[in-house]
From Swiss-Prot:
Gene: HMOX1
Free-text description of this protein's post-translational modifications in UniProt: A soluble form arises by proteolytic removal of the membrane anchor.
Site (described: Important for catalytic activity): 140
GO molecular function: heme binding; heme oxygenase (decyclizing) activity; metal ion binding
Lineage: Eukaryota, Metazoa, Chordata, Craniata, Vertebrata
TM segment ranges: 266-288
Protein name: Heme oxygenase 1
Reaction catalysis annotation: heme b + 3 reduced [NADPH--hemoprotein reductase] + 3 O2 = biliverdin IXalpha + CO + Fe(2+) + 3 oxidized [NADPH--hemoprotein reductase] + 3 H2O + H(+)
Family: Belongs to the heme oxygenase family.
Swiss-Prot/TrEMBL GO biological process terms: apoptotic process; heme catabolic process; heme oxidation; negative regulation of ferroptosis; response to oxidative stress
Keywords: Apoptosis, Endoplasmic reticulum, Heme, Iron, Membrane, Metal-binding, Oxidoreductase, Phosphoprotein, Transmembrane, Transmembrane helix
Amino acid sequence: MERPQPDSMPQDLSEALKEATKEVHTQAENAEFMRNFQKGQVTREGFKLVMASLYHIYVALEEEIEHNKESPVFAPVYFPEELHRKAALEQDLAFWYGPRWQEVIPYTPAMQRYVKRLHEVGRTEPELLVAHAYTRYLGDLSGGQVLKKIAQKALGLPSSGEGLAFFTFPNIASATKFKQLYRSRMNSLEMTPAVRQRVIEEAKTAFLLNIQLFEELQELLTHDTKDQSPSRAPGLRQRASNKAQDSAPVETPRGKTPLNTHSQAPLLRWVLTLSFLVATVAVGLYAM
């Protein structure tokens, strides 16, 4: 009897997800902004924007995880004590923005689209939620320590870890062993071939949503770097404002009004912020 060829053998879901996201991972990995970050070119203002972006993502993700924690399509990979990042990000934002951080953190159109998709998945297609959880949590768990050290050195942060709680997973003794457990649980999820393919496609969507964040900022840079004079700074502010107004209405977390802080950002902030955003995704997913 003919034996099945290796390429035709069924693939674990975790391996299928990693394979399917190779192309989009390469797009992020080869970005010049990632190389900038690896050189330690990140400012405090840029880092603050990144942390605010992560907060919006994780608030939406973890809200939908809680709604679906008892569902068979997600329950096996429900690890709130080990993985959830909202509380850690709240600590970090208080450090970076002060006690009234909720009133001042930015919420860009691309971030709104990301949050909207997370809520759509959680409420209408919860079987796809695992794609977002896998992409985010294992990526951040894998690359977090590398990014933490780079940021700590570049920003002159204390060794105590203040402002970097997001990158610390105190309830995970061994990242390697936990990732093995998580993959095993994920591979045990029962799903039809059709659902499995949708999960794989959703993982690509998750990655592309991250890349869209970079593209949004890059678009602002492309227009405004044509004229470097200080008098052109309002142009960046006006485009950022128009972009937010022209975007389709989306649901904001906990009724929060989107805040547009582009008007207060110097041009250099966007370059350095992009470098860190790309590194956050690319380094993390590369190590998954």
